[in-house]
């Protein structure tokens, strides 16, 4: 199952329907939208070499400053495409209709992007951050040869899991172990990576997990995901770049619930409202306390709506992104004030 999960992550793709913004159309009639499969672990700027030739005959002359939006909402290029989709489409939209712009870069909202070079820099920088969180330093990334670093990046760009699995053990990022993972191991490529015996001794059983948490908070409750309103501004999304301390207790499985509770304690207190717990309808005080605490409505990782009882070790070892960060998208009902 673990091998299938990692393969799912690497082969996962989102069908995109890319529309050229009307202000960039210099031909008549306007070109039809481009249809592209976007890798979940990839980034939107990496699609430009596929998309730009399609629209080239319709573009006005001049220098390009390419960016994407969803229903007028500028998309941050350094967030993986799959995370953007999970975060912005509560009810999955297929194909996902995006608009591409070749002018008018919104520098007040998006940091500049110089194409693949910027995306690669972001990836390597994230890799260094992850290793610092896990190992307390980033020397293995820094000491990686230039050719290995290039090959690692190429494996991510091309979605080549086999090449990535050969190269990533050199980073010695370690794996997460608890009683659950020891019993069910060891089918994950990231827990079965072939490492020379001289390197095994240096492998770390990490207790700190790099996590990027994206929290979208709604003031009004909803019954169905299609009722979730559109996002107007990035201010509606809280972003936490924070490690999870993986606590190992004998006889206890550290779950996704435990991890999220460490990140969002205001939504995961003893009286917080979560699914699967029995409550007395007559207990008004308990119900009021639940509303005051707010409610986690949805947790998504790699497009999967996660049950909070799943062992966190499985989630980390199988659903993390190639830069060794676990990206978690959360939809919450805000506490009543």
UniProtKB/Swiss-Prot annotation:
PTM info: Conjugated to ATG12; which is essential for autophagy. Conjugation with ATG12 involves ATG7 as an E1-like activating enzyme and ATG10 as an E2-like conjugating enzyme.
Chain intervals for the UniProt region annotation (Disordered): 271-290
UniProt note: phenotype after gene disruption: Mutant plants are hypersensitive to nitrogen or carbon starvation. Early senescence phenotype. Hyper accumulation of salicylic acid (SA). Increased number of peroxisomes and accumulation of peroxisomal proteins.
Entry keyword set: Autophagy, Cytoplasm, Isopeptide bond, Plant defense, Protein transport, Stress response, Transport, Ubl conjugation
Compartments where located: Cytoplasm
Family that this chain belongs to: Belongs to the ATG5 family.
Function text: Required for autophagy. Conjugation to ATG12 is essential for plant nutrient recycling. Involved in a negative feedback loop that modulates NPR1-dependent salicylic acid (SA) signaling and limits senescence and immunity-related programmed cell death (PCD) in plants. Involved in complete proteolysis of chloroplast stroma proteins in senescent leaves. Involved in the degradation of damaged peroxisomes.
Protein name in UniProt: Autophagy protein 5
Gene responsible for this protein: ATG5
């Amino acid at each position: 199952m673990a091998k299938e999960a990692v393969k799912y992550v690497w082969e996962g793709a989102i069908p995109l329907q890319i529309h050229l913004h009307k202000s960039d159309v210099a031909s008549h009639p306007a070109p039809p939208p481009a249809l592209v499969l976007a890798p979940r672990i990839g980034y939107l700027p990496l699609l430009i070499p596929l998309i730009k030739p399609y629209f080239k005959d319709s573009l006005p002359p001049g220098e390009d400053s390419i960016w994407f939006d969803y229903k007028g909402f500028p998309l941050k290029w350094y967030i993986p495409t799959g995370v953007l989709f999970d975060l912005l489409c509560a009810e999955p939209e297929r194909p996902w209709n995006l608009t591409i712009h070749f002018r008018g870069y919104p520098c007040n909202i998006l940091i500049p992007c110089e194409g693949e070079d910027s995306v690669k820099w972001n990836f390597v920088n994230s890799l260094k951050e992850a290793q610092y969180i896990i190992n307390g330093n980033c020397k293995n990334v820094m000491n990686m040869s230039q050719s290995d670093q290039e090959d690692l990046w190429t494996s991510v760009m091309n979605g080549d899991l086999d090449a990535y699995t050969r190269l990533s053990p050199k980073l010695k990022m370690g794996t997460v172990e608890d009683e659950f993972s020891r019993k069910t191991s060891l089918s994950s490529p990231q827990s079965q990576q072939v490492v020379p015996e001289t390197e095994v001794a240096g492998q770390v059983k990490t207790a700190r997990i790099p996590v990027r948490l994206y929290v979208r908070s709604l003031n009004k409750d909803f019954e169905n995901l299609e009722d979730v309103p559109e996002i107007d501004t990035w201010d509606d999304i809280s972003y936490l770049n924070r490690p999870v301390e993986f606590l190992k207790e004998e006889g206890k499985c550290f779950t996704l619930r435990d991890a999220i509770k460490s990140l969002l304690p205001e939504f995961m207190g003893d009286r917080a409202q979560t699914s699967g717990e029995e409550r007395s309808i007559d207990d008004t005080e308990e119900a009021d306390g639940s509303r005051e605490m707010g409610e986690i409505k949805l947790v998504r990782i790699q497009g999967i709506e996660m049950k909070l009882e799943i062992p966190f070790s499985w989630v980390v070892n199988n659903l993390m992104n190639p830069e060794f960060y676990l990206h978690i998208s959360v939809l919450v009902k805000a506490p009543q004030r």
